[in-house]
Regions:
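Signature of long, low-cysteine stretches enriched in small and polar/charged residues
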Residues: 94-167
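Boundary at the C-terminal end of the N-terminal hydrophobic targeting segment
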Residues: 19-23
Length: 219
């Protein structure tokens, strides 16, 4: 997902193949990560040569490198209550409900001062998705690369999140706009430009995912 210079790409090619650590709940097949549930597989967005790392649990996988890539993909199976909420509320209200009660609540539990910068329902993406942007004080995943702010100022990370339902699983894709904290005051993108960067990166991740068809739909 990050842009690499031609020289760096050439160096990587000369180094030969590298592998990710295999101590994970899911599995690596070629250039793809397969979730523990088998519900999806995704083209891996990081390179081990650039410090790329994969960590996961039965529900969440995280991809991160040493430069500016931080992506998490969560897949939560809907129980009977959640399926009922989804069917009675409709896609938009259900995703807002899920985001507020689970995703946002989790951020607020871990970081003080979390704010919703904006949110938008996108009916044309994944048959209805919720796109949100969060400001997370002290929530960057790249603390060692933060540009000095002076005084007691705390860097405010920005996360783009995309929520949708697929095959009775709620998916939450989350990406940090790492450049915002790495470059600090030198980062000159407007809020609208930042949102567009995150939106494109989120959609790129969706394009990397292949979902497993429900058992009844398989031939």
């Amino acid at each position: 997902m990050s842009r690499l210079s031609p020289a760096l790409l050439l160096l990587i090619a000369c180094l030969g193949p590298a592998v990710f650590a295999q101590d994970i709940a899911g599995k690596i097949e070629g250039k793809s990560y397969v979730s523990p549930t088998g519900q999806f597989h995704v083209q891996i967005p990081v390179l081990p040569e650039l410090g790329g790392d994969i960590t996961d649990t039965p529900n969440v996988v995280t991809f991160q490198d040493d430069f500016n890539v931080y992506v998490s993909i969560a897949a939560f199976q809907q129980d009977a209550t959640q399926r009922w909420e989804n069917s009675t509320r409709g896609a938009k209200d259900y995703l807002v409900y899920f985001f507020s009660n689970f995703v946002l609540a989790d951020f607020k539990q871990n970081f003080e001062g979390v704010q919703i910068e904006s949110a938008k329902f996108v009916p044309g993406t994944m048959e209805g998705s919720l796109l949100t942007y969060l400001l997370v004080p002290g929530g960057t995943m790249f603390p060692e690369r933060v540009s000095p702010l002076g005084g007691d100022a705390v860097p405010v990370a920005k996360r783009g999140n995309l929520l949708f339902v697929r095959n009775s699983f709620v998916y939450v894709i989350s990406i940090e706009l790492a450049e915002r904290v790495i470059e600090g005051k030198a980062y000159g993108k407007s809020t609208e430009e930042q949102d567009e960067i995150l939106r494109k990166r989120l959609l790129d991740m969706v394009d990397r995912i292949t979902f497993t068809a429900p058992a009844a739909a398989r031939k």
